[in-house]
């Protein structure tokens, strides 16, 4: 009788310990599960977005559906960079899905680049740093270069927080995305945020969040 009691006691103890460990890992280290990790700049899954802009010449491939369609088209090209994107995202405390979304919009996962450059020779790398605004380092799809690009993005978001402390988290993130592309001086009021850019990026980011980024 005693051995049986001891056996079931050990089973209960192991089960309890395992459950506590799983809970503590997920609650203390959000990096474990991609859907729980959103970094230091807000949860993109809660942010409103309208997707890619619609106009008279683009009524079929616009809105959230259009953004998700383009994100899915780029998924195969971006998947090989998933581990790198996650590592860089966690290094800079920003959602990897947001990085993937920018890469999708700017370079389609590098598929349209020529030796890392756009067709005009003005923008470089997966996130397409403008050589007139920045000084790109490293090879176009290297960890070194992606760290630089994401570092610039997060600095722009932090600058928005300092410049506009009364803005909400979503506005500061969207302002940072706009400033990454256009420069800090272009943002004076929330109306200066590039809605076409940020709505498309956020819709793509939500897609990538649901696909393991």
UniProtKB/Swiss-Prot annotation:
Localization of this protein: Secreted
Q: Which residues form the signal peptide?
A: 1-19
Q: Name one GO molecular function term.
A: lysozyme activity
Q: Write down the EC number.
A: 3.2.1.-
Major enzyme class = hydrolase
Catalytic residues at 106
A GO cellular component term found in this entry reads:
extracellular region
Keywords per UniProt: Disulfide bond, Glycosidase, Hydrolase, Secreted, Signal
What biological function has been recorded for the protein in this entry?
Answer: May act as a potent antibacterial protein that may play a role in the innate immunity.
Q: Which family does it belong to?
A: Belongs to the glycosyl hydrolase 23 family.
**Protein's name according to its UniProt entry:** Lysozyme g-like protein 2
Organism from which the protein derives: Mus musculus (Mouse)
| Name of encoding gene | Lyg2
